[in-house]
Amino acid sequence: HVGDGLYNVAFSGDVHYDDTRLFNGAVNDFPRVETLVMESTYGGRNDYQTDQEDSEEKLKEVIRETTTEGGKVLIPAFAVGRSQEIMLVLEEAMRKGEIPEVPVHLDGMIWEATAIHTTYPEYLRDDLRDRIFHDDENPFLADQFNHIDGGEDERQEIADGGPCIVLSTSGMIEGGPIMSWLTHVGAQSDSSLVFVGYQAQGTLGRRIQNGWDEIPMNDRSNSRGTLTLNMNIETVDGFSGHADRQGLMNFVRTMNPRPEKVLCVHGDESSVQDLSSALYHDFNMRTFAPKNLETFRFK
């Protein structure tokens, strides 16, 4: 609220219009709102995500194929949100016998972030909250989840062992323990690297997605300077914490009340401009695609 509340600005944050395994869909019912500042990560005209059910099936297929061959599945993931979403998929799939019961190793801040989700289940999706509160069934505490706390020695032991799944930060392969896992597992042709999140332009994750197999390690964890990737590279869309183009349009279409102005932010330049233009044409509202440090006066 600005001043006495005569002008009201809503910030979408990272918004997902539909329910996910972890959270209920975004709330877009407000007492008053004049301007909406909305993310545009997948706001491009061709940014449509795969249905989550299809995405889960593809992930399970990659896991089945890789573990059957004796390999390891390495999943770079954001510590908050994405990792817990994937954990729920893995726990259910193993419980139902849809994928082999192999260890799932959690590295980086994933364990700590998951503990926060477990501590505050009242903020989670309704049915997940009920499982934890009323059924005394916490999927995040399943036996297959293992916290990596032994450093490089433990990672090397796992890399030398049998089939497993590794969830590790950072989600865009820009540092963190994922670099160590690439060093240990990257040369294994029977293993798979699976992207389940957005890879921004300029990140190492995006370069690997685009076909790079000679990875500069920059003295992070590999004295050789570069690493040759022999792993299978897979991308599974549909797990993003961001709504796709249709979801963003639906968020505004069903918003109550509908804002007078929309500032499209947090996206590649083309995505921001595409979404801003689409909102203007579809809803006849004032829309903007701000540049960095551009200033707006609300009145």
PLM features: residue spans?
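Short, compositionally biased "basic patch" segments
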Residues: R21-T41, E122-L128, Q199-T228
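Hard-cation-handling environments
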Residues: L59-L204, D219-S221, Y280-H281
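Generic long, charged, amphipathic alpha-helical segments
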Residues: M217-V252
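Core dinuclear metal-dependent hydrolase active-site scaffold
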Residues: H1-N24, E154-A159, I165, P177-W181, ...
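Active-site neighborhood of phospho(di)ester-bond hydrolases with catalytic His/Asp-centered motifs
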Residues: A10-V15, V37-T41, P76-F78, L106-G108, ...
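C-terminal structured "cap/appendage" subdomains that terminate the fold
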Residues: N250-Y280, M285
